[in-house]
Amino acid sequence: MSINICRDNHDPFYRYKMPPIQAKVEGRGNGIKTAVLNVADISHALNRPAPYIVKYFGFELGAQTSISVDKDRYLVNGVHEPAKLQDVLDGFINKFVLCGSCKNPETEIIITKDNDLVRDCKACGKRTPMDLRHKLSSFILKNPPDSVSGSKKKKKAATASANVRGGGLSISDIAQGKSQNAPSDGTGSSTPQHHDEDEDELSRQIKAAASTLEDIEVKDDEWAVDMSEEAIRARAKELEVNSELTQLDEYGEWILEQAGEDKENLPSDVELYKKAAELDVLNDPKIGCVLAQCLFDEDIVNEIAEHNAFFTKILVTPEYEKNFMGGIERFLGLEHKDLIPLLPKILVQLYNNDIISEEEIMRFGTKSSKKFVPKEVSKKVRRAAKPFITWLETAESDDDEEDDE
């Protein structure tokens, strides 16, 4: 038996089908859960990763979920009838599968260079945006599909230089229109390739400025750079102190100046992002620490969700998350000690909105550090996280017991 992917479509010749949801209730008491048995089949029919579907159930039903792709086991806490889950799945299909123009399900999720989500329709050719305010959008941005087309996201390169702005090319390469993936002509040179859609703003600005300059002949034998380990460390330290720190300080001061003492005039998320790009601090993980200290006041628990989409766009790696949590630690331990008891609620918001990963929250709550605050302050703050950490550990142990059965 199969049903229409778009259940509102009653055309007898409608050819897009999927299996109906199959589910069964497991356990009893506080540990009762609903196992969704055929998520993999539904995932295949919708061309969407199975975790997206289960996470959507969790967000819409207000329930915790357990996802084990390897074991093909997907659980949603609580009792949920298949009919109810099918209705919730309709919402997922409308928001994250069907084309916003022709309502055809032949779409792929595209993550653009600006970290926006769009549905690329293979039927009508249109691209329609998805709602970034939905919690699942944050999850998708942090866990992109295996094959992301359109934005042509590349896997992390093996060298650090390949992951910086400009694709690891020198300024002169960018000015000459060379691309990181430009084919070689056999002489070591590359053929210019123009990808205006993927090219970042900084590269375009460099090209525009460089096009007005005369060619300069560089003779390799006229100068040399000391590449000893000591010299590299010295230069790195000097750059960090004189450039990065200054730019981050300027960014933090700008936020506080714009917001005012009561923070009623806090810049919008768009303005915050544009200013960070202008000061070139988006690639510095320490921006997370600055944001955590500058954006919040006594109402931090409610304010976190207001910036959900922005944080998802900024906190793109564990290092960014670690710095953000360090900023939270400074905010509570040094500036608002009276708010330390609210830390479990703060962690709930960060966890439920997929801003900070479970791994980073566990690390933060179980090990003190003197990186951001004095050791004693760190212990006091992180000790307050214990109720939430205990809940996380209990949830994990319950899932393990279910798997053993």
From Swiss-Prot:
Keywords: GTP-binding, Initiation factor, Nucleotide-binding, Phosphoprotein, Protein biosynthesis. Residues 177-192 have a biased composition (Polar residues). Residues 241-402 form the W2 domain. Pfam families: eIF-5_eIF-2B, W2. The keyword Nucleotide-binding applies. Transmembrane segments: none annotated. It comes from the Eukaryota. SMART domains: eIF2B_5, eIF5C. One of its GO terms (molecular function) is translation initiation factor activity. Present with 48300 molecules/cell in log phase SD medium. Monomer. The factors eIF-1, eIF-2, eIF-3, TIF5/eIF-5 and methionyl-tRNAi form a multifactor complex (MFC) that may bind to the 40S ribosome. TIF32, NIP1 and TIF5/eIF-5 comprise a minimal 40S-ribosome-binding unit. Interacts with NIP1. Interacts with SUI3. This is Eukaryotic translation initiation factor 5. It comes from Saccharomyces cerevisiae (strain ATCC 204508 / S288c).
